[in-house]
């Protein structure tokens, strides 16, 4: 295994250098405590740093110093972005996102804080997090909210992972004033998300995968020009972040003596169960990255390393399934790609890429599960990437760990930046936690694969981490048994913690390295031909037909009789042991279209649940960015019944399309009236008042769409999809 995975195996004696696929990096220790790092494209001098490791590998020690240097380089007193304040500096004693990204983004700074910044630079990290809190512009809407940055279809609620902010904030609650800000933001943000993106039928929160936010890179190609599906879908990573936020809300509510603590706990318990059940795909022994919408909640054959790692760390998965999912996550030459399988037609970015911050989360998850092979491979992948690039880059091509591979239209990574903040934090985390086992709470629980002993210890009996006046010493084990080295006896000698490592048995099953890395191409949408009192849907060879959330046994065609309900169908192709992403969906059944822009009168012809959407245009911004997704409240008023209310979303569109679907329950024969009320989108936050990259910034709140009709029809059951 070591020969396949290891830095140690590639150069067990010359621990000052690393060679990978014909490229070499080398480090030299200097007398002043600094280092010189040389890599294929250059050389840099790294000065002495506040923290220092003493191992058998000058390269390991130098890369830790480089991460500290790059964290210092990411410290700024002002930030800027062309889309805000006309690109002029905005005062903020915080961190910029990277050399090419001199601004603060909610997702980036939050993951970076959770990995390392909160423990190393707490006050500056609080400043960065505070920058992403905002009241509403109108001065009347109560509460403080976490800002969802510009994004797919006009931002929130298409993207709904802003709750990652609370993952970072939970490590900074020792400051009472900040803790109160966190509590205030939790209440408002969670209430808003519960109203706008929680689906009570499915039990999950809707919205885009966290971090994987470039539509066709990881979602089907057909989402490139229509992000409604993304807004309606359910993502593993985003739901785990909502779960963690709910647990924090429960904790803070109890501290405040707030009766809502029990409600937050109930919500979290139910969400944990829904995550564990709905995302688990038994045939692949894996948790999928996302599901289809509530009308068709199929599991898409895509897994993502961040989602799996966050789920492991949050303990939302049953232990054995967690082990199986992480152990079974595929490996390629450069490490663990952030998604699996890959798309042969997409350029390199999230597709076909290793992202260091995600590798750091996988390392953290592997430690939690005592997965020695995964701990080793993630540490080594992180070392290779930063050493061969001479910086903690944003991302790398997954096989070569190159910062750019030329392949015509599929070249990439399409975007890349040196000293990317979350990559820097990921590397720091890998050393502090991954090697020395030092937790943010001061605990020392090393879990070091024995395969790394030659690299780190060489002929030494100890390796050392100096952190200010504190010293952490790991003593080499005397016995050779056990694949995972953990803490035995621990001695405290003044400011020095001495840990005697002992061997523990661990599963040494290496991750799979599949030869086939590309998914089959996505099929076209199913085609239905009218036949008698129903439809015949032909099933092309090599594809599986899904209906209302589950696969059908039919192999050549399906004859679907009219039953008075809406049915949703899609196709997926299977080849070489892999399944494609799903085709665009086909909806069959009695769908009534009622013209109108704000109010509609309608009489239900049958009782039960109905699905409703709006036909609209939203030309307020491009499909890939902005803050002006139209968010409205659709009310249903039926004679003798309580008013029902749901949030409907109309993302930026390319021409005319349908909004997100919502569900209402009606009684047959009742006359009902639908009407729209205004909602809340990100342009309503004061945070975006200086946004000049599109509408909804300096021109004021923009929450509009051109609605032409309402579509309504009886819903089919999706229970078989659970």
Spell out what each predicted region is:
Residues 557-565, 571-722:
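Extracytoplasmic
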Residues 6-102, 176-179, 187-195, 251-260, ...:
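Acidic/polar, glycine-enriched structural segments that form the non-catalytic walls/loops
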Residues 20, 54-103, 127-155, 198-233, ...:
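Extended glycan-interaction surfaces of carbohydrate-active proteins
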Residues 59-67, 121-134, 177-196, 241, ...:
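Extended, well-ordered alpha-helical scaffold segments
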Residues 102-209, 235-243, 353-380, 406-437:
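Aromatic-rich carbohydrate-recognition surfaces in CAZymes
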Residues 532, 538-544, 607, 618-620:
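Short proline/glycine-enriched turn/loop motifs at strand-loop junctions of beta-rich domains
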Residues 365-368, 373-534:
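Non-catalytic C-terminal accessory modules of carbohydrate-active enzymes
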């Amino acid at each position: 295994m070591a020969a396949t995975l290891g830095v140690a195996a590639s150069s067990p004696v010359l621990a000052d250098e690393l060679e990978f696929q014909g490229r070499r990096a080398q480090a030299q220790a200097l007398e002043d405590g600094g280092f010189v790092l040389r890599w294929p494209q250059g050389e840099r001098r790294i000065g002495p740093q506040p923290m220092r490791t003493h191992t058998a590998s000058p390269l390991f020690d130098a890369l830790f110093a480089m991460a500290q240097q790059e964290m210092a380089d990411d410290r700024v007193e002002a930030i800027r972005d062309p889309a805000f304040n006309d690109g002029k500096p905005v005062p903020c004693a915080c961190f910029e996102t990277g050399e090419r990204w001199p601004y603060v983004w909610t997702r980036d700074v939050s993951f970076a804080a959770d990995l390392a910044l909160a423990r190393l630079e707490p006050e500056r990290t609080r400043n960065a997090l505070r920058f992403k809190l905002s009241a509403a512009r109108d001065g009347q809407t109560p509460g403080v909210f976490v800002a969802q940055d510009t994004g797919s279809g006009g931002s929130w609620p298409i993207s709904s992972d802003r709750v990652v902010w609370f993952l970072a904030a939970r490590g900074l609650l020792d400051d009472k004033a900040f803790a109160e800000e966190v509590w205030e933001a939790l209440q408002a943000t969670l209430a808003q998300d519960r109203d706008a993106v929680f689906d009570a039928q499915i039990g999950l929160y809707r919205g885009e995968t966290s971090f994987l936010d470039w539509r066709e890179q990881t979602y089907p190609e057909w989402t490139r020009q229509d992000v409604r599906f993304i807004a309606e879908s359910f993502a593993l990573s985003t739901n785990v972040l909502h779960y963690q936020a709910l647990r924090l809300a429960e904790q803070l509510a109890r501290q405040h003596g707030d009766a809502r603590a029990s409600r937050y706990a109930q919500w979290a318990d139910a969400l944990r169960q829904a995550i564990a059940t709905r995302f688990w795909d038994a045939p692949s022994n894996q948790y999928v990255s996302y599901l289809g919408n509530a009308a068709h909640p199929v599991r898409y054959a895509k897994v993502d390393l961040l989602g799996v790692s966050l789920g492991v760390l949050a303990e939302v998965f049953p232990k054995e399934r967690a082990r199986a999912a992480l152990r079974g996550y595929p490996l390629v030459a450069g490490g663990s790609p952030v998604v699996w399988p890959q798309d042969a037609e997409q350029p390199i970015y999230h597709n076909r890429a290793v992202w260091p911050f995600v590798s750091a989360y996988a390392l953290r998850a592997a430690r939690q599960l005592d997965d020695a092979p995964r701990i080793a491979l993630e540490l080594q992948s992180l070392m290779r990437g930063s050493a061969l690039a001479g910086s903690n880059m944003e991302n790398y091509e997954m096989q070569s760990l190159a910062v750019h591979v030329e392949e015509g239209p599929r070249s990439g990574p399409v975007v890349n930046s040196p000293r990317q903040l979350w990559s820097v934090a990921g590397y720091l985390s890998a050393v502090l936690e991954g090697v020395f086992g030092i937790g943010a709470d001061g605990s020392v629980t090393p879990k070091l694969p024995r395969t790394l002993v030659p690299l780190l210890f060489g002929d030494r009996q100890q390796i050392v981490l100096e952190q200010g006046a504190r010293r952490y010493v790991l003593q080499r084990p005397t016995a050779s048994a056990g694949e995972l080295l953990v803490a035995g006896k621990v001695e405290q000698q003044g400011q020095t913690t001495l840990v005697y490592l002992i061997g523990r048995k661990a599963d040494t099953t290496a991750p799979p390295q599949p030869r086939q890395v590309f998914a089959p191409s996505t099929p076209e949408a199913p085609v239905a031909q009218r036949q008698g009192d129903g439809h015949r849907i032909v099933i092309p060879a090599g594809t599986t037909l899904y209906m209302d959330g589950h696969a059908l046994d039919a192999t050549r065609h399906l004859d679907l009789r009219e039953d008075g309900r809406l049915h949703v169908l899609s196709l997926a192709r299977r080849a070489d042991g892999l399944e494609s992403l799903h085709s665009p969906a086909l909806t069959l059944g009695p769908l009534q279209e009622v013209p109108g822009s704000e109010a509609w009168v309608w009489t239900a012809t049958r009782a039960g649940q109905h699905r409703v959407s709006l036909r609209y245009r939203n030309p307020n911004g491009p499909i890939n960015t902005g803050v002006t997704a139209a968010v409205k409240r659709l009310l249903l008023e039926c004679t003798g019944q309580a008013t029902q209310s749901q949030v409907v979303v109309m993302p930026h569109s390319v021409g005319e399309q349908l909004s997100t679907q919502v569900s209402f329950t009606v009684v047959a024969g009742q006359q009902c009236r639908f009407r729209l009320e205004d909602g809340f989108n990100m342009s309503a936050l004061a945070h975006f008042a200086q946004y000049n990259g599109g509408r909804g910034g300096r021109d004021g709140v923009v929450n509009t769409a051109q609605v032409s009709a309402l579509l309504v029809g009886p819903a089919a059951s999706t229970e078989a999809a659970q």
